[in-house]
Amino acid sequence: MTRYILLAQLLVASLVFAQDEIPERLLLTGGQQLGSGARALGLGGTYTGIADDFSAIWWNPAGLAQVKRIEVQGTLLRTGFSNESSYFGLNREGSTDAMRLNNIGVVFPVPVYQGALSFAFGYSQVTDFERRTQVESGQAGQDWDNFDEVESGKLGQWSFATAVDISPNLSVGAGINYWTGSSDYSLLGQYNSTVQTEQSIFTDLGGWNFNLGGLYRPGRMVRIGVATSTPFSMSLNEEWVIDGDDGYFDYKMSYPWIWRMGASVAPGRWMLAGDIEYRDWKSLEFRGDTPYEGVTRAEGNRQIRERYESTTRISLGGEYLFPAYGLRGRLGYSIEPSNFKDAGEDADKGVLSLGFGVLIDRSVMLDATWRTASYTEEVTTGLKEDIRSSQTLLTLSYRM
């Protein structure tokens, strides 16, 4: 359950929730953290030490120096979300899905006398907010009798990046990003046995930051990459409607550092890769007044540090080339820990990825990936959520 307490705190005085606490889940800490491109995600997100197409603009901009021909890339994403919730003993299932653009962009390599120089521009969706929770109480006297909570939206970035070889075996890259996205949340429910409520909140997101990266090639088969996405101040502009009353609130939160390190080795027809990604969620903080009644900036930031923890995602991936068919098969697996301390021992995600890529007429690359994860969250008292999520991606790349 993500955000209903936020709305209830604003206007519904009869609820018993504390007025001096932030919600169980803040918007910026939720959603499915994805990434860019079917090939990268087919390898489990192990792309920091590969990064040899447009999607490097997100994973490791230094890898753009490996692109030797003009490349145009686009990716479609279909997400699925299913949530079997148990609220004090009674089970209900809610599901939702959506289809969106995952990325679109172009890479321009520039002819130089020695080494490589490339520029890239495009869009990458990196977070998906699709979620649904349906609840019916199996025990009399609880705060909620039933509700249907739905959230949809996305968070992505428009980026301009460049990469250059500074030595025969070392590339560096940097990008400037404009983050943009939105979340559309609604809740229909009944509480205290008699009171019906209808609530909605729409949030626009925006901010600027930088991506930095390096890629070292100690030999023909090995690549080692490091990358970071710098922290920045995210603007959140909210418009809410609760049982016919409406209003708005604008505030800012700092988005944390993201650090990545990865390596790949490609002996013959095989390629094996591994990545580590660190997100400093404890550094998330309000930059001014909070939108929650009775919660000061200092108190809100104290509660963030108490409730959230930094995460380290570990991922492994492999790719095998079938030369007779021009086909590459892919397999990936990642462990993605929950950033909420009290989400339960089964809240960490194990994400399995399967994919393939095929070269068409030497210029067009078609990549497809399917990912799935199952996990359990116990964030709200009395509520257990067994969640299954999936993503299907299709990438088309054309090199001139």
Feature map (PLM): residue ranges:
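Sec-dependent signal peptide recognition
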Residues: 2-9
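Transmembrane beta-strand segments of Gram-negative outer membrane beta-barrel proteins
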Residues: 22-47, 65-82
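N-terminal signal peptide c-region/cleavage motif recognized by signal peptidases
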Residues: 13-15
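Short, charged, low-hydrophobicity "junction" segments
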Residues: 4, 44-55, 304-306, 342
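Outer-membrane beta-barrel porins/channels
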Residues: 19-41, 103-400
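Outer-membrane beta-barrel translocator/receptor signature
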Residues: 50-59, 65-139, 152-156
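Short structured motifs
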Residues: 59-60, 302
